[in-house]
Amino acid sequence: RFRKAAALGLAALMAVGSVNFAGVTTGAAGLPTTDGHDKYVNKNVFDVISSDTFGTKELESPLFDKTKGSSDITDLQVPTLAYDESSIGLVWQKPEKYDNVADYNVYINGKLAGTARENYKVNAAWAAKYMESFYDYYTTQGNSDVDMVNVDIHAYRATGLQPDTEYTFKVVAIDKDGKELGTPQEIKQKTTAKAEVLNIKDFGAVETEGYTSYDDEKNAIIEKNTKAIQAAIDACPEGGKVVIPENTDGKVFVSGAVWLKSDMTLEVNGTLWASPNSDHFEIGFLMYPFYTDTRGWGLVNAMTSDESNPIKNVRVTGTGTLYGNGWKYGAGSTMYGDGLTSNKGKNTQAGDPTDTETWGLPRYMGGGNVNVFYQGIQSKDSAYKYLKNTGKYDDAKIESLRTATTAAEATAAANGISKDDLKFAYATRSSLLIMRNCENVYVGDITIENPSNHSVNILDSRNIATTNVKVFSYDGNNGDGLGYGCSQNVICWGNFTDTGDD
């Protein structure tokens, strides 16, 4: 299933591109080597194979040798906006010689603060837990000959820091015995001043249950919340922070689309729940200029059409959730109960963590041009309204789509509707976080769950950092995880995605 590749691949590649095949022993890296890779990879030197137009051919000599060269780390940096008033994030590249690298020591102001691996378990907990469970299973219970890669962690987050204070960091590789390798590399970074905080409750936002249907009363509350959150954003001073506070008694903040501006942080500590009414998400978003299907904008957006004046310096952070309200719970075409009760942890597979209460994953129905009419929530509403607004079909036909509760009812209701109309209706589904033409973006720690369409779209932007973002969208149709279309200078590390698509 895709989530296995995502959990491991994102955790590794997002640690600034560090994946080494069978190059670190179990004792050194804390992760296994496998006999499976010995068939293809020399333990000492990679035999790199290059493809050309006519097939494959072996190079005359290896492109690199992990047993030679400098033991110094390289490219130590603080990614874009990966710092605030109390924390600073670091990333780096592994040394040229890395055959004996097991971990990295990190010093703060001359004192050893810890290692990259231990820090990763705290600051990228989902990626770390699924990596640990995966490797544990396939080296003890599963097929030990399965091809796996060793993952080197090239990141560290310092927390509990003081505002408006400069810190000096040094990072150095260590071997399995803790011996330092090479010369420590140094970087300085200052935390920000303490930000002015604007709580959306102070602007009139109210907590309710998570709506999966709507009427006039619910619409009024949703529109009140949307206006309150937008008012807080509009009032936010430069460098300020708009906070969606933690919820109480399982309640959430239900909202329509909101729009961020330059020089601000949106800190989501509670749940921002997307309205089930698709009218609260303006139609007009084109994924790419050459697309013809017009979609709804996201729950949270940062966008300008003025390419010479991009949205700048935007952070989206917090311990909470952007919840898309897109699909009912289920597996494929089989609904879980009424489709509205969470099935978190009910669909485990070999290699998943055994503690499903903490680490269990939800699963959503698969979707499709016709299935959306009984499997969808917000996704159903947008498709239904598109067809209604075409004016091509009588009210009874449209109403039968809205009230379909089974595959048979949806199929019967869709009979007589053109395939093109069904396709374009389905395409109107909105996403969760959309950023376009932005410069200097940081997205960290939040959970993105159950989008109608895509999870995160960062498009036509530059200088982007994402870390410890959890995406739960499996097996909803599309449900893309972290998307960076036509963007530059992107650094991702420690993210976890369980997606039904990219």
PLM region descriptions:
Residues L10, M14-S18, L266:
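Hydrophobic core
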Residues K4, L31-D502:
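Extracellular/periplasmic carbohydrate-active domains that bind, remodel
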Residues R1-G9:
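Bacterial Sec-dependent N-terminal signal peptides
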Residues V16-D35:
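Sec-dependent signal peptide cleavage junction
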